Curated annotation (Swiss-Prot):
It is found in: Cytoplasm. It comes from the Bacteria. The keyword Isomerase applies. The keyword Cell cycle applies. This is Trigger factor. Consists of 3 domains; the N-terminus binds the ribosome, the middle domain has PPIase activity, while the C-terminus has intrinsic chaperone activity on its own. Residues 173-258 form the PPIase FKBP-type domain. Belongs to the FKBP-type PPIase family. Tig subfamily. Its EC number is 5.2.1.8.
């Protein structure tokens, strides 16, 4: 096999590979000899089938394997001999307009096998000195007021409702049980019908204006509720449209007293109110710490990004940009928006998000090299913990989710990647100066610019919600 390097430009490499016909012939005969004792052909004793007859029966199928093995061998030889680190799998090209002829002649061992191997290699770079890097860690402790607000919400959400006396009108804060049928232009629409639906008036659970029109209703009343779906409604076919709902009120119940006491704590599995307060404070603090970590990580990645400048493999950038751009287009579609609505153009947005893709690739390569240099590993136990955490998100489908990940190495790798990244980030944090800075809740949860919010590599944390105390209540209750 002859391998000749023909191109070496930046991160691109090209090699010309030639496997002469006589070598193909030798490889074919070797493979046929190897299967001689394994095949059974009528009229021949086992192991006594002439190679010429084997070639007649199995020649083309065996030669196809020979050719595939030759291509794989060439790729491996190039990578090993040149000490290359590949960005993506090699591309194989045959001479234009001659591919079919070359392959057919090679299959018959009547012609040379000639092809080109195109590669993109990973860039080489030295890890930067980070001793001069200083980043802020935002610190916020839960206040008594925040804990009490969360307790009030928990008490409100867990309170009981008692039926109002016969003939009583529904008030804001009451819970009504209703049947409804929605229509647009006189036609019922999907998702517009419900039976025995409990609705707390004033909770803003339904479309704006819907609940207000049920205040004053009595059991047995039928009302025509007229509303307009918001322009940004998640169901595109309904967004911005006027609708009418025929509503029948079947029950009206008043909320019970909201008490924050030991009984409330026991309803949430705690011994007493003090234990519940501790759990709520811990849950809120955990959310604050998670948001602080997101901000700290972003500032660290910003600092890393400013420390490196090297060529990026075009294929990796293209791949990353395609993924980012698909998210952008899906987001616009979901919100029913255009680039013009966002005050930009498609071309300007593509340029902006291409920079984001480049940043992700660059930081991904840096973090990978840091991890390799520091010999950072993710254990199987850690991957299993992540897998079981993922499985718990799909109650009732545990086995299907488990089987999916165990039978899909790529999916399992996607669980391992963020674990590896967090370990690398922790390692890098140990190389920089971290200064704690007390901040307000507003400052902690202030959103970054959209372009900056997308960080590097696998770091794709979602923007947090400022209503974190609701999640904290769930955690404390869990």
């Amino acid at each position: 096999m002859q391998v000749t390097e023909t191109t070496s430009e930046g991160l691109k490499r090209e090699f010309q590979v030639l496997l002469p016909a006589n070598e193909l012939e030798d490889r074919l005969n070797t493979e046929l000899s190897n299967i001689k004792g394994k095949v059974q052909i009528k009229g021949f004793r086992p192991g006594k089938v002439p190679v010429a007859h084997l070639r007649k029966v199995y020649g083309k199928s065996v030669m196809a394997d020979v050719l595939q093995n030759a291509v794989n061998e060439a790729n491996q030889q190039i990578v090993t001999d040149k000490g290359l680190r590949l960005a993506l799998e090699p591309q194989i090209e045959f001479p234009k307009d001659e591919e079919q002829t070359i392959i057919e002649r090679a299959l018959d061992a009547k012609g040379d096998l000639a092809f080109k191997v195109k590669l993109e290699v990973l860039p080489s770079f030295e890890l930067a000195d980070l001793s001069d890097v200083s980043i802020k860690k935002l610190v916020l402790k839960p206040s008594d007021e925040e804990v009490n607000e969360t307790l009030e919400r928990m008490a409100k959400d867990s309170r009981s409702f008692e039926p109002r006396e016969e003939g009583a009108e529904a008030q804001s804060g009451d819970r009504v049980t209703i049947d409804f049928v929605g229509r647009i232009d006189g036609t019922e629409f999907e998702g517009g019908k419900g039976e025995d639906v409990d609705l707390e008036l004033g909770s803003n659970t339904f479309i704006p204006g819907f609940e207000d029109q049920l205040v004053g209703a009595k059991v047995g009343d039928s009302r025509l509720v007229k509303v307009a779906f918001p322009a940004d409604y998640q169901a595109e076919q309904l967004a911005g449209k006027d609708a009418e709902f025929d509503v029948t009120v079947k029950a009206v119940a008043a909320p019970g007293e909201t008490k924050i006491d030991d009984e409330l704590a026991k309803r949430f599995g705690m011994d007493d109110l003090e234990k519940l307060k501790e759990a709520v404070s811990k849950a809120v603090g955990s959310d604050y710490e998670a948001q602080s970590r997101r901000k700290l990580k972003k500032e660290l990645l910003d600092a890393l990004d400013g420390k490196y400048a090297f060529d990026l493999p075009p294929s990796l950038v293209h791949q990353e940009f395609a993924a980012v751009w698909a998210q952008v287009e899906q987001d616009l579609k979901t919100r029913g928006k255009t680039f013009e609505d966002e005050g930009t153009t498609e071309e300007a947005s593509q340029a902006e998000y291409r920079k984001i893709a480049e940043r992700r690739v660059r930081l991904g390569l840096v973090l990978a090299q840091v991890g390799e240099t520091a010999d950072i590993k993710v254990s199987d136990d850690e991957v299993n913990q992540a897998l079981f955490a993922r499985i718990r998100q799909f109650p009732g489908q545990e086995k299907q989710v488990y089987d999916f990940y165990r039978n899909n190495p790529q999916a399992l790798a996607e669980l391992r990647a963020p674990l590896f990244e967090e370990k690398v980030v922790d390692h890098v944090l140990g190389q920089v100066q971290v200064v704690e800075e007390p901040v307000s809740k507003e400052a902690l949860f202030a959103e970054d610019d959209e372009a900056d919010a997308v960080t590097g590599g696998a770091a794709t944390d979602e923007k947090p919600s400022e209503s974190n105390n609701e999640a904290a209540a769930d955690k404390a209750a869990g």
